[in-house]
A protein has these predicted regions:
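Long, charge-dense tracts
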Residues: 1-2
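Outer membrane beta-barrel transmembrane domains
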Residues: 7, 18, 27-55, 60-66, ...
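Outer-membrane beta-barrel translocator/receptor signature
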Residues: 222-225
Length: 230
């Protein structure tokens, strides 16, 4: 299976395959391309480091393995590897990056009918993180005696100092046919893959009634609680 998806400033082309070995083991594969306009692996830039008129093409492969331990208990492992090529605008100090390798992982345990008509999940995951690669910057030397300024290319290592790990707990309860209660809590270590960043805590409480969704989220890394209504 496959298809092309447009998401704001990005376009993706994906192909999926799922194979059931038996009733207990399911293997899924996902491959594709993602083209970002004015973006690069979550990088934010402005001024001299603007991402305006830039482009980034990422090629990725994902693997999912699901093991049904019992009828109501499943263990799921996912992993993604991607290679990215970035081309910056000629007016930006961000010039280019080639074959930047990034990866993400997750391990999730789902238990259905813990107390009846509900689902409990615990997961440990690493968001997308650069494992290898460098970014080429356009840097200028001091002007010579004639006032000429030399522009030179300088490589900067993109591998971060830390590794973000998210430990999440999620609970969903069907109170009635049209009424669902949901709760989620997450502990984040080394936020944004920065080694010295403090541990963060976040949570979400939500109610779904027919087509109405109401939720409140809060965390130590945001200034105030957020209310969502859909």
């Amino acid at each position: 299976d496959g298809g092309e998806v447009y998401m704001g400033g990005s376009t993706s082309l994906m192909s999926t395959m799922e194979y059931t070995f038996n009733e207990d083991v399911i293997l899924g594969l996902l491959s594709g391309f993602v083209e970002e306009k004015e973006g690069f692996l979550g990088l934010e830039g402005n001024g001299a480091f603007t991402l305006d008129n830039s482009s980034n093409l990422s090629k990725f492969n994902s693997l999912k393995i699901q093991k049904n331990v019992r009828d109501d208990l499943a263990l799921t492992l996912t992993g993604t590897l991607a290679y990215s090529d970035f081309e910056g605008d000629s007016a930006s100090l961000l010039k280019s990056a080639d074959n930047v390798l990034s990866e993400s992982y997750s391990l999730t345990l789902n238990k259905a009918n813990l107390f009846g008509n509900d689902n409990f999940a615990i997961s440990i995951s690493q968001p997308n993180r650069v494992r290898d690669g460098s970014l080429t910057l356009r840097l200028s030397d001091l002007a010579d005696i004639d006032g000429n300024i030399n522009i030179r290319d300088t490589g900067v290592d993109l591998e971060p100092s830390g590794r973000q790990i998210d430990t999440s707990f999620a609970y969903t309860k069907d109170i009635s046919e049209n009424f669902t209660f949901s709760l989620k809590a997450t502990i984040t270590d080394e936020f944004n893959h920065i080694k010295d960043n403090d541990k963060h805590y976040s949570g979400y409480i939500g109610l779904n009634f027919e087509n109405l969704k109401v939720g409140v989220s809060d965390g130590t890394n945001i200034s105030r609680p957020s209310l969502s209504l859909k």
